[in-house]
Amino acid sequence: MCIRDRNIILAAEQAIPLADRKVHVLPTRTIPQGITAMLSFDADADVEQNLIEMTKAADNVSTAQVTFAARNNNVGGQEIKEGQILSLENGKVVGTDTDIHHATVKLVKNIVNTRRLTGKGVDFITIIYGEGMSEADAEQVRDSLQAKYDGVDITMINGGQPVYYYIISIE
């Protein structure tokens, strides 16, 4: 099983003994990590080798998510007001904004800079845009990022997901 929700990982691991076949849990934390792990599956490799390679692939993914605050809240001492744009890095709120485009580009830029400072390269950025965003909106984000990161392969996918304006995979 490729689990992408950290709240479900423990339950999935506890269910292993109940299965009527051999089951392994790959504890991914975000949708892009799960997708990348699945894409690295090799039908010719054994289970252990696949677990190693799929885990390695998932661990190389940074995830940016842009959504909105559904209510007033306080996260880590930061006041968040209902309706504000939220920037999440690997599931954690790292900023707020009033403009979706600005929040998205700034978030990706910060993640790319952090990856480069820590020795992780950036070869691919995949922009998955949600039901509230048009293809033209996503193209503007892509174009802004392409202007900053020449040589990085940037693709767009209409994910149609609710709640998140953008889910972005950076690897």
Predicted segments, located by residue:
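Short gly/pro/ser/thr-enriched loop/turn and capping motifs at secondary-structure boundaries
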Residues: 6-9, 29-35, 162-163
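Short flexible coil/turn linkers enriched for glycine and charged/polar residues
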Residues: 19, 29, 118-122, 160-162
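Internal, active-site/partner-interface "lid" segment
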Residues: 19-22, 26-108
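C-terminal edge-of-domain segments
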Residues: 155-171
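Polyanionic, low-complexity intrinsically disordered segments
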Residues: 18, 23-25, 143-148, 152-156
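Glycine-rich phosphate/diphosphate-binding loops and the adjacent beta-loop-alpha structural elements
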Residues: 79-102, 107-144, 167-171
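Short Gly/Thr/Asp-enriched flexible loops that form oxyanion-binding sites at enzyme active sites
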Residues: 7-19, 137-142
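Short, small-residue-biased leader/transition segments that mark boundaries at the very start
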Residues: 1-3
